[in-house]
């Protein structure tokens, strides 16, 4: 039987730790594309690596793949043209860099595109970026929920440390992939994951960073932090149930509680700084914090906690994060009109944030 050809862009934690193990489990023919030459060299040399699971005493050997450098354009286009599945885990903001390859590739058969990225309907957004005329390419939206941190203590450069726990949902497409659950509609799964995983995770990172705590699990060991996150989670669940009657409240409560247990796992050693980068993206209207704000506003849920989160986002100053530095510069320049636009908050709520930021400047 002919093997399914898959081409995956991105040899980072999600690519190596989650996506390739799934493809290997399905006995797919795997081609992995990566831009970092050092990573490519090591993968081509060692031809295997281990995935170590941090929520159980298990590991998995991944050794059935070929590796290519993204700069090898002719070869990548050849692989794209014969692929049954093309997938990504390179970061949503980097997808536009693949446009040239997609423009040059001639798709003579049906190809499925799966973007395993954080965010709202990223595959659909990618389709809009590419504007392909070829109807052979089927863009399928995906939701992926697993924690794959930048683990510091590694015996082997290539090895990945992540959760074995993984939930992946995709809208229905004409290929069965073990490990990927297909649904007719993803809306509920997207919003549930965006708010009760991505948003809460980021909030913990913000709290920890402000308190000069290094890891997520350390942050949750502070009682006041756990209390704040639990209250926000309860508000989110109330809002989701009000907005989507098909949600079961007890199931959401269990889901939220389980996520906090996952985040509190000390073996994961998840850096708070990993979770709070790219603050401008996180304030986008298609992103986590605005989604919560909009839901709370519509369903008349108190805004004090989510506004506190907005304030933390704007005050977080990470020296090596471009977006964070951009916000810090605007605050120092008192560029309130531009900051108000970036926040997307309504005037009454923005004025509360502005007052707090002004106080911070005065203190300096």
From Swiss-Prot:
GO MF terms, alphabetically ordered: mannitol-1-phosphate 5-dehydrogenase activity
Keyword Ribonucleoprotein assigned: no
GO CC terms in record: cytosol
This protein's record includes keyword NAD: yes
Keywords assigned by UniProt, alphabetized: NAD, Oxidoreductase
Matching Pfam families: Mannitol_dh, Mannitol_dh_C
Enzymatic reactions: D-mannitol 1-phosphate + NAD(+) = beta-D-fructose 6-phosphate + NADH + H(+)
EC nos: 1.1.1.17
InterPro entries, sorted: 6-PGluconate_DH-like_C_sf, 6PGD_dom2, Mannitol_1_phos_5_DH, Mannitol_DH_C, Mannitol_DH_N, NAD(P)-bd_dom_sf
Annotated NAD(+) binding sites: 6-17
Intrachain S-S bonds: none
One Gene Ontology term from the biological process aspect of the record: mannitol catabolic process
NCBIfam families linked to this entry: PRK02318.2-4
Family the UniProt entry places it in: Belongs to the mannitol dehydrogenase family.
Protein name, UniProt field: Mannitol-1-phosphate 5-dehydrogenase
Native source species: Mycoplasma pneumoniae (strain ATCC 29342 / M129 / Subtype 1) (Mycoplasmoides pneumoniae)
């Amino acid at each position: 039987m002919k093997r399914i050809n898959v081409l995956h862009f991105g040899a980072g934690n999600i690519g190596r730790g989650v996506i390739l193990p799934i493809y290997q489990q399905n006995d797919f023919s795997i081609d992995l594309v990566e831009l970092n030459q050092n990573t490519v060299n090591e993968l081509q040399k060692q031809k295997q690596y281990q995935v170590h699971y941090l929520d159980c005493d298990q590991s998995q050997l991944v050794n059935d793949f070929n590796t290519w450098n993204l700069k090898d354009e002719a070869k990548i286009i050849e692989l794209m043209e014969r692929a049954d599945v093309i997938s990504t885990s390179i970061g949503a903001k980097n997808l536009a860099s693949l446009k040239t390859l997609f423009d040059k590739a001639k798709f003579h058969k049906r190809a499925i595109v799966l973007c395993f990225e954080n965010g709202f309907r990223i595959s659909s957004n990618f389709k809009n970026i590419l504007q392909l005329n070829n109807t052979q390419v089927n863009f399928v939206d995906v939701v992926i929920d697993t924690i794959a941190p930048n683990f510091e203590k590694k015996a082997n450069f290539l090895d990945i440390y992540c959760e074995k726990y993984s939930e992946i949902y995709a809208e229905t497409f004409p290929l069965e992939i073990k490990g990927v659950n297909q649904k007719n509609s993803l809306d509920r799964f997207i919003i549930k994951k965006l708010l009760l995983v991505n948003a809460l995770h980021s909030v913990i990172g913000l709290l920890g960073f402000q308190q000069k705590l290094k890891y997520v699990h350390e942050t949750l060991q502070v009682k006041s932090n756990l209390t704040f996150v639990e209250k926000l989670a309860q508000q989110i669940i109330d809002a989701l149930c009000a907005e989507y009657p098909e949600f079961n409240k007890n199931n959401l409560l269990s889901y939220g509680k389980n996520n906090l247990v996952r985040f509190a796992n000390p073996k994961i050693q998840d850096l708070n700084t990993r979770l709070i980068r790219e603050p401008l993206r996180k304030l986008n209207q298609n992103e986590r914090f605005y989604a919560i704000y909009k839901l709370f506003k519509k369903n008349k849920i108190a805004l004090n906690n989510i506004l506190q989160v907005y304030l933390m986002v704007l005050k977080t100053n990470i020296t090596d994060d471009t977006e964070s530095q951009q916000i810090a510069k605007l605050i120092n320049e008192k560029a309130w009109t531009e900051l108000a636009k970036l926040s997307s908050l309504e005037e009454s709520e923005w004025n509360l944030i502005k007052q707090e930021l002004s106080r911070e400047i005065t203190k300096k």
